[in-house]
């Protein structure tokens, strides 16, 4: 019997997402990962994204806040937080968008990853106004 590490579980869950599995099905998996790895910013970032896709905006806000607290330099965590804030009517979105924009401009690989994430979100959830707004702010200023 093999020993499955939390990293393996995380990678498998990401693979399932990338294969098109619905966000609602993956939320419990990522919630469990976050419960077991409380300081894993990537896990919290993924959970926030899944909550956003599932229209669970208050839960997304909490998960995104945790991800940003754990890694303030993660532009995806900042984007998730900005979208969750827009969806829940919070103030202070600009600060998170500006930080994501600065990081994306400084590091081309992260810019490309962000663009892929925006594309994925709009493919899974067409006409997602908040995501479209944040995308325009990050890339067009």
What kind of region is each of these model predictions?
Residues 91-93:
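Short, charge-rich, low-complexity interaction segments located
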Residues 50, 84, 121-125:
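TPR/TPR-like alpha-solenoid repeats
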Residues 103-141:
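Terminal, low-structured helical/coil segments at or just beyond the last alpha-helical repeat
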Residues 42-46, 76-80, 95, 111-116:
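Alpha-solenoid helical repeat scaffolds
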Residues 83-86, 117:
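Conserved short hydrophobic patches within well-ordered secondary structure
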Residues 1-6, 139-141:
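Long, contiguous interaction/recruitment modules in multidomain scaffold/adaptor proteins
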Residues 4, 39, 73, 109-113:
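Structural signature of alpha-solenoid helical repeat junctions
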Residues 10-71, 76, 87-89, 100-102:
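Alpha-helical adaptor scaffolds
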